[in-house]
Amino acid sequence: MNQCKVMNDGYLEKRSNGLLQLWKKKRCVLSDEGLRLYGCKGDSGKEMRFEQMTTLDCVEYKRGLVYFTIVMNDGKEVDFRCQQEGTAWNAEIALALVRFKNRVAVQTGRNRHLSHLGSCGEGDVEL
């Protein structure tokens, strides 16, 4: 996610995939291309790109925490939670995902339109 616009930077807790499914605090950077997760050891981070995401759902509010799930294209679900007060991470991620998908749809539509125009010669008449 180089040269991307950073929309939010802060902390979320991610549920681990292990047997105990412990919650681990991650520093998260939300950009216009996706979400990058960093562990406490300052590693290079794990990238969750919007092009690999299907949706954000299962938003639940319990005891001052917001729980939500990001569903990936392969069906994998990644669970997160954060404090209810402060930044609404779930809403920011969902809006950024919608913006990304809209941008891709507009670009796809433009490409189809330009491709269609290129296939019709200037003298051609469409019926």
Swiss-Prot record:
Membrane topology summary: Peripheral membrane protein
Entry keywords, A to Z: Apoptosis, Cytoplasm, Membrane, Tumor suppressor
Record localization: Cytoplasm; Membrane
Subcellular location, principal: cytoplasm
Gene Ontology terms: biological process: intrinsic apoptotic signaling pathway in response to DNA damage by p53 class mediator; negative regulation of phosphatidylinositol 3-kinase/protein kinase B signal transduction; positive regulation of apoptotic process
GO CC terms, sorted: cytoplasm; plasma membrane
PH domain sequence ranges: 5-108
GO molecular function: phosphatidylinositol-3,4,5-trisphosphate binding; phosphatidylinositol-3,4-bisphosphate binding; phosphatidylinositol-3,5-bisphosphate binding; phosphatidylinositol-3-phosphate binding; phosphatidylinositol-4,5-bisphosphate binding; phosphatidylinositol-5-phosphate binding
Keyword Glycoprotein listed: no
SUPFAM superfamilies recorded: PH domain-like
InterPro entries: PH-like_dom_sf, PH_domain, PHLA1/2/3
Family label: Belongs to the PHLDA3 family.
Reported function: p53/tp53-regulated repressor of Akt/akt1 signaling. Represses akt1 by preventing akt1-binding to membrane lipids, thereby inhibiting akt1 translocation to the cellular membrane and activation. Contributes to p53/tp53-dependent apoptosis by repressing akt1 activity. Its direct transcription regulation by p53/tp53 may explain how p53/tp53 can negatively regulate akt1. May act as a tumor suppressor.
Comment block on domains: The PH domain binds phosphoinositides with a broad specificity. It competes with the PH domain of akt1 and directly interferes with akt1 binding to phosphatidylinositol 4,5-bisphosphate (PIP2) and phosphatidylinositol 3,4,5-trisphosphate (PIP3), preventing akt1 association to membrane lipids and subsequent activation of akt1 signaling.
Protein name stated in the entry: Pleckstrin homology-like domain family A member 3
